[in-house]
Amino acid sequence: MIEFDNLTYLHGKPQGTGLLKANPEDFVVVEDLGFEPDGEGEHILVRILKNGCNTRFVADALAKFLKIHAREVSFAGQKDKHAVTEQWFCARVPGKEMPDLSAFQLEGCQVLEYARHKRKLRLGALKGNAFTLVLRDVSNRDDVEQRLIDICVKGVPNYFGAQRFGIGGSNLQGALRWAQTNTPVRDRNKRSFWLSAARSALFNQIVAERLKKADVNQVVDGDALQLAGRGSWFVATTEELAELQRRVNDKELMITAALPGSGEWGTQREALAFEQAAVAEETELQTLLVREKVEAARRAMLLYPQQLSWNWWDDVTVEIRFWLPAGSFATSVVRELINTTGEYAHIAE
């Protein structure tokens, strides 16, 4: 298995270094649900500004304040602890009376707004996230500047970030132990984290191998393509390659890579043979995913940060802003810019 730090770069390995997350204010995330609260219903959506706080810890504190069980509080996604984040939480509180959530107090947290909503906020139920990052002590301004320009055109590999694999790769190691021992895992959180890490690592490996080819955006026979921003896909045939290539070049279509699991992967012929070869040695993880009935899926190989802009405060400090769809990692963007330093550069929750 290719280590995360050794995954293939789209723009080549960065020439310089820089400090990421020198302080929480250097990594700002604003959650974009893509919808507004209904204004009625048995649930309450609460938007909270948090600084240096773990998502689960805030959810538990909110449940305690509302005097409800912790399972009655949900959120759309884990947010970085070592950052300033605006995040929505959802609490099931039936009844006509609206609790005074402005009275909720927790160090590092501030309630920004709240309103009733008809449906529970489920994991993954968000449109995306807006990021504002500050990179400090940049050693090669010219290299970073050119990379930002290139990313606007060519994007970055849509790798799952190092956070997905746990501190020191602990989630992936757990998945490997589970695969090797076949011992039942009762803890639902561990099951979820380990299976997710296994599938993410296989996806990253497929993308890394594809990037070693001459042109990662070259459509091959049997590729699974999806409309940009959509989840469904279709298979490319030899007769269509020229037209499909034009649509890929126009960013209308995205070439996908497999999220391996049970069932068909989605590719055929040349593309399927390539994907299978890319992870042929990772039989234990593949067997685990099939055994645990994790369905195979697809994910775009490349990621195009939207609304990308930047401002150099001086020759060694740059502020970068962009928006990413749900499930994408800001650290996978930064990885193509600089070799990051800093205690929390790769750490999330």
UniProtKB/Swiss-Prot annotation:
GO molecular function per UniProt: RNA binding; tRNA pseudouridine(13) synthase activity
GO process annotations (BP): tRNA pseudouridine synthesis
Record key words, sorted: Isomerase, tRNA processing
Gene3D superfamilies noted in UniProt: TruD, catalytic domain, TruD, insertion domain
Disulfide bond annotation, renumbered to this chain: none
Catalytic center residues: 80
UniProt keyword Transport present: no
Residues at which substrate binds: 27, 129, 329
Record field: catalytic activity: uridine(13) in tRNA = pseudouridine(13) in tRNA
Enzyme nomenclature, EC number: 5.4.99.27
Keyword tRNA processing: yes
Domain spans labelled TRUD: 155-303
Signal peptide segment: none
PROSITE patterns for this protein: TRUD, UPF0024
One cellular-component annotation, GO: cytosol
Family: Belongs to the pseudouridine synthase TruD family.
Function: Responsible for synthesis of pseudouridine from uracil-13 in transfer RNAs.
Protein name, entry field: tRNA pseudouridine synthase D
Gene: truD
